[in-house]
Amino acid sequence: MLTTDRLAELAKALSSTGITQITGQFLYHHGGFSPVHQIDPDQPIHLGYNPSVAGLNLNFNRVFFEWTRNGQSYDFKLEGRDLQFRPKANTVRMTSERRGMEVFKYAQTPELENWSVARSALGKGGGRWLPVRRPGTYTADVFHSLARHYGVALPMPQDAMRLQAHRRLCHIDSAPLSEILVDMLKHSVNLTAEGLGRAATRQSGGDYSTLKTSARHMQEWAVRQLNMPDAQFVDHSGLGDQARITAQDMVCALVAAKKLMPSFPVLLRQIKPRDTRGNIDRKSKALIQAKTGTLHYVSALAGYVTEGVDTPYAFAIFTQNLDRRARLT
């Protein structure tokens, strides 16, 4: 996924062409993927795992919010923060309010994304990631700052709406798809799942205009290719609470995936076997390659046992604690 430091490489490459300013327009384009405000509209607005989804996605569509105490008030920073560069996010604004339980509130104007935070939640200082809901504007704004850092003066960015005739001056390549998949599976990155899912739908000729239509196309493909007759998808990440999948469907999908792509298990995490007390079983020779899934009241594990057993097999374990869920809701 695109990060600020990778975007800085593009700004540096632009500078190396000898361009120092442009007199026309600075346009950005989503590559044909219309922006989606958030994956699941029923989730709280401030959750970073429920970001917007578009063709331009920067820093997992998150902005870093940092606050420090300054006497009786607070100083705020909103940055497209990365390891090397920390450009200010000019398209996002934060204010504080004296109010009760609701920690964050969000609103938009034509120019800005406006957040407010309850002062009682701030303490002495701290920082956290917040989602951005206009990822194209955010990405272009960060690039505008990075270009200025490398001596290229650009006008304020504008949404191109549709791609126009153009000539490529420079580019950067993404990581290989296999690396992107490994990162997605390791860190459970919903945005990556949605981006790859929509891209796959477009590549196969389906309707990718919304997450729901794209997910329906994926569902139809999964029924045909992965033997998942009971699967119901409303997005590509599984975040929406209307999504349904059985353990049987998951096992069928794992078996079919290995046939379609024999190297698929190596994308998964290697998990060491444990005994009935939860301790690592050092005597076991089993090789478990699997994906974990954990929420407040749900725990899941699905993958393969490929070595150390008489017959390799796929498995899926889904568990939930309904009493805990009831307490949370």
Task: Indicate where each model-derived feature is located.
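A conserved catalytic-loop motif detector
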Residues: 19, 27-84, 242-284
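A small/polar active-site loop signature that marks catalytic segments
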Residues: 92-264
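C-terminal soluble interaction/assembly domains
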Residues: 217, 228-329
